[in-house]
Amino acid sequence: MKLLLISPSNRPGRKVLKAIRIPQLGLHILASLTPDDVDITVMDEQIREIDFSLDFDLVGITCMTATANRSYELAERYRRKGSKVVLGGVHPTILPEEAIRHADAVVFGEAEGCWADVVDDFRKERLQKFYRAPAPDLSKYPAPRRGLGIDKTLFNCVGLVTTRGCPYSCEFCSVTDLYGGKIRHRPVSMVVEDIKQSGSKTFLVLDDNVAGHPEYSKQLFEALIPLGIRWVGQSSISLAKDRDILNLCRQSGCAALFFGVESVSPASLAGMKKSLKSIKETEESVKIIQDHGIAFHPSIILGFDTDTDAVFDDTLAFLARTKLPTMALNVLTPYPGTRIHRRLKEQARIISDDWSHYDHHTVVFKPKNMTPQELAEGYRYVQKEFYSFSSILRHIPSLLAVTPVDLRRALVFLLLNFAGKSVAKYIDTSLDWADNREKWRAPEIREDEAATGGAPSGLTGR
């Protein structure tokens, strides 16, 4: 039996910079749960093009909303070749009836809970249309089966999971739809063994909140200290309030953390169930975390209902005050299944159901206090200003300001700056923004416009 596991791209042919590539993990976990006599191939379309000359008996495709269209295209292509196709991931979990139109089977939830049944049913020619996977006990599953595809990045960084689930219930987030609102842990001993078996000293911890359960985090960080590893991950900003955990986090080898700042608008923050309710608290937390030797990488979202056009300059001012050298900037994206999608749908404010546009770059809804075009151009403005060449030069001292000085971290963050500049250029040259129209037309890739004879209008200056 020949099995293919695919992680698709929503922009086929556009490769991701090696320095910021997120190591694939989910498919390698499925591979570890597959019988040894199965010939397994893993393909990550962010790294290289899929080789359609190869034939497979069973194809599994992991599907996010932004990659749904591409996932369906790949599924149909392999079905025409005679393969059976299984779709899984957050998008099929939310919209299984849509997904099954393009596949032979759909998995709800975390596939580890039913993957053995899927493979067994396929072999016995009794593949079911739907498999509902219970939330798995993470202590019962082996380490990922690495080495089947390119699952490493710059500095031999590999993916690692210690927990799943998130106790927060943000209106715009789909994490709890897939993993639930209760944090589940892998036994610390299993995490340590996984690290030792990986052969790497550099890790990207893919948990949604690596410090979400202080007691577990303390045990984990203490166990990591003797291993001498380096890692980056994601945490809630409330970590700044627990100095003991913060100290252990740094001692365990943490070089940087991704934090959901979400907004620099006090009105927007007030509407969220966040531990910090003011920009002053956020700025104080940035300083505390960086004073502990951990670089702070913020995620900021534009387009909340309380945002006005002042939010764009306010965002740049916040980044300047905190001297943060990197950021992840996103347009608010109302994923299907989330509370915000249901609310905006009820208010007739969703303006695109093309899933490839749900990519954090594209405006797919009508904002409350500005037009879709104003939000799109404001997003472009912030991205372009922050990652301009002159701004990157100003960021360099900040790259070395977090002590102890970490040259590898500084190099990765510098590469993140150039990746951000590349994203700004992509937005500027590859997306077609609407002109003066009452209804926003979501952007298409320039090549698609050219193929249909359309002429992109281009981005106007702010």
Q: Where are the model-predicted features located?
A:
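Alpha-helical structural signal in soluble globular domains
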Residues: 33, 37, 77, 81, ...
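Hydrophobic anchor at the start of a short beta-strand
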Residues: 3, 40-41, 85, 203, ...
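Acidic, low-complexity intrinsically disordered segments
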Residues: 1-199
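Radical SAM enzyme core and accessory elements
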Residues: 2-5, 36-42, 122, 150-152, ...
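Radical SAM [4Fe-4S] cluster-binding motif and immediate context
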Residues: 143-297, 302-304, 308-317
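Structural recognition of alpha->loop->beta junctions
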Residues: 98-117, 248-258, 314-329
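Flexible glycine/acidic-rich beta-alpha junction loops that bind and position SAM and/or redox cofactors
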Residues: 8, 12-13, 98, 215, ...
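Structural detector of well-ordered beta-strand residues that form the stable sheet scaffold
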Residues: 86-87, 107, 129-131, 232-234, ...
